[in-house]
Amino acid sequence: MQNTSCTEDRIQHALERCLHGLSGSTDISSNWTAGLCLNYWSLEELVNRDATNYIILAEKTLARTREAQKNGEYELLTPLALMFYFAVLRAPYIPETSDLLPKAFEVFHTFLTWPAPYCHVYQEMLSFISEEQKAPGITYQRLVRTEQGIPTRSSCSSTATVLLVNPAELPSEFLSVAEQLSNAEQPIQQTLVSLIQHLFQASLGTHAHTEELGASLKSRPIEKLQEIYSDLTEAMEHATMADIKPGKKRESLKAKLLEVAEKAGLMQGNTGSSLTSRIQPIFMPVAKCYTYSWDQDDFDILNQILLSESHLESLEDDVTEEDEEVDFEEVDDKDEDGGKSPKQDSVFSNSYVYWNFPSDSKEDPSMSMSNLASHSMTFVSSLSSCVDSGYVEDSDEGSQEISEIGEYQEERANNKLKQKICQLFKTKGHQAKDKLKAELSPCISHPLLSPFPDISKTIPLRRAGSMYTPQLSRIPVRSKRSKSLPQPAFGTQFLDLQLSQKVAFKRRPFLSCDDDTKVSTLRIVVFGSDRISGKVARAYSNLRLKESSCPLLTRFFKLQFYYIPVKRSSSSTNAPMTNAESPLKSPSPSGRFPLQDVFGDEASTNDISHYIGILDPWYKRNIMGLMDLSTSMLCQSSKEENETTETTTMPILADMVLYYCRFATRSLLLQLYRAEITFDSGGKQTEVFIQCLELGHSADLRAIRASGPGCKRLGIDGDQDVIPFTLQIVYSKSTVSGRSRWSNGEKVCTSVSLRKACNTYEELDSKMECLNLTVREVVKRQNSKTKKSFNQICTSHIKIDKAQIIAQHGGTFPLCLDQDERKILQRVIKCEVSPCYKPEDRDFCRRNRRPSWSQASQNQSEFCSLLCLPIATFCGAQP
């Protein structure tokens, strides 16, 4: 038997507790799952106590992976990979003599032949291990650098996390945790010192002398720290790209780091190991977060990120200065050559934050340059009607050019000096706002630009040049006319031209996971029940429509959506809560809350989170499992307030939110459904839902509940007492073969509901995804002695994929989407429900649809792309 220490035994026990119940062979009662979601958080707290614990956890995880592979415990493979990734990511130092990474590479390499998602997960793990062998700690550096928005010479990527909360539905403790995350940003100087300490320690170990290094760095100004960190980052990035053996790469990296340290006067010749030096754990800072109150069917509030994010400055100061120094010389060279050599404007450089031209290897660079040239020539020629004639005699051209070159140099020097002076007295927020006003001119109709109605007037006057038009060469100096002549003005013709040329810029596809051209990532974290998930679905659909006509958010950001289920607070519904101390309580295995009225209708459900949890057990354990804990436990910190630590201690909920955002990298696509609604007035409206659509009495009940205390005087009748109505229900049932069978009939009923079928694993097949049609039919209506009618109800359940519901005999019915009291539509006479397709493909589908609605093309999904909501998960879709 192998001798182990007490710490190793505790880590092994904590690891087994994290994996307990994830295997399909283990059956856990729902009554005993309350504390399972805290197992991983407890493991992190245990490992963070000492720097050597990370390597112990990595070794234990690797051994458990071999055992899971041998025993066929496939459900454990992705959680084990995530825990190994965490251990190596947070390890302050892995000795060169350690065989941990080579062994892991050998073990993980066998999973490349496995089906998805295992092959994708371990392919990323192999890339991660390979980079860590070449440049230790580079993944940690990239993660923290992007979360804090720290630019370098080689990279200016950033990641912003947005927390969308609804104060009417969330407990006050949750709101305080969200505010705590937003206010946890630490000073940039402290972050740079921590990153430099981690960088040296990951490569040099005890030779880095972390404490002395930190004391030396704290006395340096921020500008000097940024310069040092940029040099160190370039050395690490170069080490990952150099084509030499990993061992030699690490030695070369050490030499480069020591060279930078000696140049900056950090080590001062003290690079040896001492008895007092030891590996210090480097705590990861809290990601930069923004908290907004949100309860709308759109994401317009996200446009505020464009104004608040500091990384939206055009370029770093050092890069801008280098470009400005060589710009005029290059312009003169181009003018002497007659403008034949293409010159790209500095705004469109590859390192610029906003714009990314197609640079993939698949695209022809000559074609892209020719397109840019044609656009530039078109733009210049189109401005001919707006530019003054500027007649100049040929005899004066030479002398005028020489004199104007000198004037141009003098103006450039003066403008540069003015810009430097202005930057000294301007805050970052003012700089970002000014640049945003000048650079976002094409999207005048976008809601973000409503505070700037005269934005076109703020565009600086410039000859034949624009922030939005690729420019191959500057107009010759002689085109600069006399100052007495009228100056050109950019009118509607300029704006129309820019809108027509937006296809020249590369924009990230919505559901693409392979295109990494965006330098900025926007994490969108939403909290709530199925009602909030429905709002996210409608907001996502509206976002696609807006961005397809005038891209703004998707032009700058790669969007990632995160969903944390929370039960609706008692203040948002009229019914009391089940447990006053557990607003997230959900003991039922189906994810539905036991809160029901006397007629059996759920006031709030969490079916979407249950759907995700079935496909991703690690999400179910660590994110959905939070609903089993009380608010007081979720909002408490791991340490008391009077204890001093290097970083701010965060509540358990905050730690798990950050863990979810950092480690959930694979998207799960949730099908959206479209409801085409016709009113009795003849008007039509199209809505989107994701979980349920209710018609009739159940929709009326939600409207009555939403009235608050007034619902008592309105009175609530059950299905047995209400007046029924007649509906014509036409629905399609899909089979395994892909054929559809249509049924048509009239029903006298009180309520009809369409719910996403997501309660069992068999219902999650993408080819068989369907809706549950529930009809409460009145089979007999009796009159009692009190002259009050009494309905005998028969409830039927049918699995469908499309449906059409039409009111008969001149009647109407109410309709409610995703349990949202604000989305109750009255006086509806017809409702068509079908899967939602992408806007660009819907017209094609309608053109190819047969005249009869019930005889739609059976292979429609083969020609039209379905519109799905991407939710970030740990494992992704299971095979």
Curated annotation (Swiss-Prot):
Q: Where is this region: Heterodimerization?
A: 23-100
Q: Does the keyword Translocase apply?
A: no
Q: Classify the protein's membrane topology as the record does.
A: Peripheral membrane protein
Lineage top rank: taxon:
Eukaryota
Write out the annotated subcellular location: Nucleus; Cytoplasm; Cell membrane
Activity regulation (record text): Greatly activated by G gamma proteins.
Region annotation (Disordered) maps to: 314-345, 570-590
**Keyword annotations from UniProtKB, A to Z:** Cell membrane, Cytoplasm, Membrane, Nucleus
Compositional bias per record (Polar residues), positions renumbered to this chain: 570-589
Q: A GO BP term, please?
A: positive regulation of MAP kinase activity
Record text about domains? The heterodimerization region allows the binding to the catalytic subunit.
Q: What does this protein do?
A: Regulatory subunit of the PI3K gamma complex. Required for recruitment of the catalytic subunit to the plasma membrane via interaction with beta-gamma G protein dimers. Required for G protein-mediated activation of PIK3CG.
- Subunit composition? Heterodimer. Interacts with a catalytic subunit and with beta-gamma G protein dimers.
| Protein name in the entry | Phosphoinositide 3-kinase regulatory subunit 5
The root-end lineage is: Eukaryota, Metazoa, Chordata, Craniata, Vertebrata
Q: Which gene encodes it?
A: pik3r5
